[in-house]
Amino acid sequence: EEDVEQAISMIRKAQKPFIFVGGGAVISNASEELRAFAKKIQAPVADSLMGKGAYDGTDELYTGMVGMHGTKTSNFGITEADLLIVVGARFSDRVTGNASKFAKNAKILQIDIDRAEINKNIHVDARIIGDAKVILRKLNARLDPINHDEWIAHIERMKDMYPLRYDKSVLTGPFIIQTINEMTKGDAVIVTEVGQHQMWAAQYYEYRYPRSLLTSGGLGTMGYGLGAAIGAKMGCKDKTVINIAGDGCFRMNMNEIAT
């Protein structure tokens, strides 16, 4: 309870809060509470690869992924923030880059169920250990709505200045992913293998729901996608399931077609 009080004090004092969401928010089924929290404190939201879908990728507060494969808005936003609220993310090197320069202007509040993740890769100023869904519900109950209109307007300007770009004169991976997004209206289950196509799938598809992206983001296991897609279709028979694969990954486990 003392940690919750400290977090509330930090949130109330912040002028430029930013929320960073990882796979822990998906595991804890915290999407509803996360959305309410972001709206209440009027903070932009970015995610990691494994956090995709925890927050609606079409929402106005969403800024995209963080890190080496992230958007400029997310990365610049975190650099400018005075408070970074991290929900269920482990600060991998793909996210932080040079750890000594990550979120250098911000106090960091980490929410995680695993005590071992606290201060492991990045030093934090405060932490709350527990289930993200439960903790966010507590914070929502204790906080009044906070206005950060100027901060959000600044983030919107960055979105306009730094959109994701690709060459539209030729057939490219980003164009294909974006077309799939338009055709499925963001309502499919996307499965990926590992490689550049995996990053395109994370960047150019708008994930609106948790568990709508199935990908091997920790160990990065090539050959994961085909079997995972078959399993996803068996579990979600009413959903369109699309496996996005490179030739090398596909050949590793193409024997799954025999299933």
Where are these regions (language model features)?
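Conformationally flexible catalytic loops at phosphate/diphosphate-handling active centers
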Residues: E1-K13
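Glycine-rich phosphate/diphosphate-binding loops and the adjacent beta-loop-alpha structural elements
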Residues: Q15-S28, P163
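Short glycine-rich anion-binding loops that position phosphate/pyrophosphate groups of nucleotides
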Residues: G23-V26, G51, A89-S92, G195-H197
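Glycine-rich phosphate/diphosphate-binding loop of Rossmann-like nucleotide-binding domains
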Residues: V26-E32, A36-K39
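Glycine-rich, acidic loop regions that bind phosphate or pyrophosphate groups
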Residues: G51-H154
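Thiamine diphosphate
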Residues: T73-N75, E80-L83, G88-S92, M199-T259
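Active-site diphosphate/adenylate-binding microenvironment
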Residues: H154-K233
